[in-house]
Design a protein with these regions (language model features):
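Helix-loop-helix junctions that connect adjacent transmembrane segments
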Residues: 2-8, 45, 49, 126, ...
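TM-loop-TM module centered on a large, flexible mid-protein loop between adjacent transmembrane helices
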Residues: 78-89, 227-291, 308-346
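Small-residue-rich segments of transmembrane alpha-helices in multi-pass membrane proteins
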Residues: 19-28, 87, 154-168, 228-237, ...
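Hydrophobic transmembrane alpha-helices that form the core helical bundles
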Residues: 56-132, 137-140, 280-301, 339-363
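Alpha-helical transmembrane segments
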Residues: 308-316, 362-378
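Membrane-interface "cap" regions at the ends of multi-pass membrane proteins
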Residues: 1-34, 38-43, 55-56, 60, ...
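Membrane-interface loop-to-helix entry segments
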Residues: 116-119, 123-174, 185-186, 226-230, ...
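Transmembrane helix-loop junctions in multi-pass membrane proteins
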Residues: 29-33, 111-112, 138-144, 271-272, ...
Length: 423
């Protein structure tokens, strides 16, 4: 979930696939496997496959919605909101935008706590808060990563994950005594909950699906790049997940807070541990920066439509010579993430992020279903599959997660009634 908001040159099919892989592989892979194993009792292959299928179906919907917009409107951050307004009306647009904001704010909190848990587990919350503040300040000053830096980080993270998998398959078991979790009996409900949580690790697929204006021949390249990227990431996740299961065993993996560290802890000279920590920090900071800026852009678009206070639509340069940024949205988003980090444990935040990510995917599928013009590879049945899959997985999450999600939606309704302009 760490793609750049803009690209400097049109991409071919291979480059688009690589950009998609980079946007998907992020902070989620460092934290999602313990929660997924705890949900279904141990298996990862079937839930991962379900999550990937739902991601593909919903990705096609995002591609359709993006293709229906003008080039300057077809972006990942607020493209779904703009399309919903054009096709379904202002209420649908607000719901889509609000759900997007909730999803990305919760995902930011997960990424921040992941970073803190890996770097300084005894001070995870303070480190997470510091990371949120740091990335917000950088965004306010308009300091972003170049394309080549982003690609290097993605390549490094993937290489580290592959190294972890090899180390896990070739190691014994964790040294000393380990904490064991009590696992549920395997069943359909557990598989669906596990798939919903694992979906969080695929959420960045939407960035690739909305890359149309930045890709040569998007009608040909994106429908090929999307399944290719998801297939590569699915293979990577299967490799890493199965290797962690082999190393820890299901009960120990379910209780592990920083699972990717375990298999490399015995590598001589702490080289493996250092590489994992650097990868976790790079992935976490990259996700925080991208999501913070993305939420600010969505808030700005909603403000322009009169759905949020006008302050979110204003831009200002922090210093003379620096680019103008959506300072209010960046600041407000960071403040919300800090509250989430301080108030909720990582597992709850992961569930909430997955819940809202699935709701956003479902909302986009509804928007795509309403489109009349479509190609042979975007049938309405695929939109229905995405909608049904997203709702089924969302409702399979724990009652606490669903309750928190519904409370946030009610809060959104209050915000709209209070601040809506131009009625």
């Amino acid at each position: 979930m760490s793609g750049n908001a803009a690209l400097n040159r049109p991409l071919g099919g291979f480059d688009a696939t690589m950009a998609g892989i980079g946007s998907i592989v992020g902070a989620g892979v460092f934290v999602v496997f313990p929660a997924a194993v705890a949900a279904d009792g141990g298996g990862l292959a079937v839930p991962l496959l379900i999550a990937a299928v739902v991601a593909y179906a919903c990705g096609v919907s995002i591609f359709q919605v993006s293709a229906a917009l003008d080039a300057d409107q077809a972006n990942y951050d607020d493209g779904g909101t703009r399309a919903a307004r054009l096709l379904l009306g202002p209420t649908a647009a607000f719901v889509t935008g609000w759900v997007f904001l909730c999803s990305r704010l919760a995902a930011s909190a997960v990424a921040a706590l992941m970073l803190g848990t890996y770097l300084l587990p005894d001070f995870a919350v303070p480190v997470a808060v510091g990371a949120v503040v740091l990335t917000a300040v950088l965004n306010i000053f308009g300091i972003t990563r170049s394309d080549w830096v982003s690609r290097f980080i993605v390549a490094f993270v993937i290489a580290v994950l592959a190294f972890v998998a090899v180390a896990a398959f070739n190691s014994g078991h964790p040294p000393g005594s380990v904490k064991l979790a009590t696992l549920p009996e395997p069943g359909l409900a557990g598989i669906l909950e596990s798939a919903a949580l694992l979906y969080f690790a695929f959420i960045g697929y939407g960035y690739l699906a909305s890359l149309g204006p930045h890709v040569r021949s998007p009608a040909r390249n994106i429908p090929l790049a999307l399944p290719a990227a998801l297939a590569v990431v699915l293979g990577l996740y299967l490799l890493v997940g199965q290797s962690l299961l082999s190393y820890f065993g299901a009960p120990a993996l379910a209780a592990e807070a920083a699972p990717v560290l375990g298999p490399v802890s015995q590598v001589s000279g702490s080289i493996g541990t250092g590489a994992v920590l650097i990868a976790a920090a790079a992935a976490g900071l990259g996700v925080l920066s991208a999501l913070n800026a993305g939420c600010a852009r969505v808030a700005s678009a909603m403000s322009d439509e009169g759905e949020l206070p006008s302050v979110f639509g204003r831009t200002r340069a922090a210093l003379k010579g620096r680019p103008e940024t959506h300072w209010a949205g960046i600041t407000a988003g960071a403040a919300v993430v800090v509250v989430l980090v301080a108030a909720f444990p990582p597992g709850t935040l992961l569930g909430v992020a997955a819940f809202f990510g699935l709701l956003y995917a479902g909302a986009t599928a509804v928007t795509a279903f309403s489109l009349r013009s479509r190609r042979w590879y975007t049938p309405r049945v695929l939109n229905l599959l995405g909608l049904a899959g997203a709702l089924l997985l969302a409702l399979s999450l724990p009652l606490l997660v669903i309750s928190l999600g519904l409370m946030a939606i009610v809060a959104g309704a209050v915000v709209r009634l209070t601040f809506r302009r131009g009625r």
